[in-house]
């Protein structure tokens, strides 16, 4: 009986197309090429590449920021409000900390809880300190740590396709989404 099952399994594998056996390599221009280990708000180990297969909004922030970073979150929430339930289910929102010294998973979870972020769609990530600059470079975020521990930084939402390629970017933040960027989000979700 075991031999028969093994033979059937072998035959099925032989009939599968090669694409079904191995995932295609990442595109050369994919942000997911950056192999930076991180932990999420639940302390689970992850990388950017685990977001593959789902359109993403990505930004960088830090949890102790009182001014601009809350607007980054507001911007993600405002975009979500403009989406249908089906569109929302196909979108992920990823916020990457630029302050891993202070932004441990507990700090990330406090922000997610306080802001009532749906963790089926939102992911807050803590990279290793040595990877912050590379991550910022990939997403076009400039930052500088100040003497008081705060950061000067560009604030942007970056739209990625399901393969991690940058499709669009906006620096318009707040409760009213950038209409051109929102149209790009909807287009990316429709082509998915």
Can you say where each PLM-predicted feature lies in the sequence?
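Positively charged n-region of N-terminal signal peptides that target proteins for export
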Residues: 1-4
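Bacterial N-terminal signal peptides
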Residues: 6-17
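N-proximal helix/coil linker or "cap" segments that precede and/or mark the start of modular domains
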Residues: 19-34
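Short loop/turn microsegments at loop-to-beta-strand junctions
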Residues: 33-34, 55-56, 154-156
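A short beta-strand-turn-helix
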Residues: 36-56
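Short active-site neighborhood of thiol/selenol oxidoreductases, capturing the structured segment around
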Residues: 49-72, 76
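Structural microenvironment flanking redox-active thiols in thiol-disulfide oxidoreductases
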Residues: 73-135
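Thiol-/selenol-based redox modules, centered on thioredoxin-like
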Residues: 146-192
